[in-house]
Amino acid sequence: MKTGPLNESELEWLDDILTKYNTDHAILDVAELDGLLTAVLSSPQEIEPEQWLVAVWGGADYVPRWASEKEMTRFMNLAFQHMADTAERLNEFPEQFEPLFGLREVDGSELTIVEEWCFGYMRGVALSDWSTLPDSLKPALEAIALHGTEENFERVEKMSPEAFEESVDAIRLAALDLHAYWMAHPQEKAVQQPIKAEEKPGRNDPCPCGSGKKFKQCCLH
């Protein structure tokens, strides 16, 4: 697998694939994917690849039927390459970390769109237990949730341009603070209830991560 940041054409290809297989349950675009991956990398507990790969599509029932193994493999490779690059920036070069916000041209001006990234981040938050986040850092999570939850839509719409800009500027530092805290205070995974035999994927069943490979052969296990 290649390393380093994805180039523009690779990001556009990921965007095209997310659009191609989009449903009401899946993430919308590469900005939302970036937000999800940032939250996964900042999680209190380790999140397995098959968990977040399924979350990309909104659940196991919505994992795409890939047009070809080549298409599936390229999607996986680019997603993991982007994740590795983001992890390196968060861990080693936080000054280089920049959320992959969207851009939209309105009346000749280019506007920064943070909603998709924040929705992706909150989708990633939902994959683990953040309940032990200290009160001192709850404003950081709220800074992202402000733009990443439907319940805050009305609040955002009523903000002045100045307040909106301030809220956008707060997202990057909030993500860095949350990542730094959980890396310094990792949490143990909760003990899971035993899975019934009939509910557990068989060794020859398709892996739930969507790779298309058998569970016993999947490169993610």
From Swiss-Prot:
Pfam families documented for this protein: SEC-C, UPF0149
Family matches, as SUPFAM superfamilies: Sec-C motif (SSF103642), YgfB-like (SSF101327)
Domain of life: Bacteria
Paired cysteines (S-S): none
Molecular function terms, GO-annotated: iron ion binding
InterPro entries in UniProt: SEC_C_motif, YgfB-like, YgfB-like_sf
Name of protein: Uncharacterized protein YecA
Organism: Escherichia coli (strain K12)
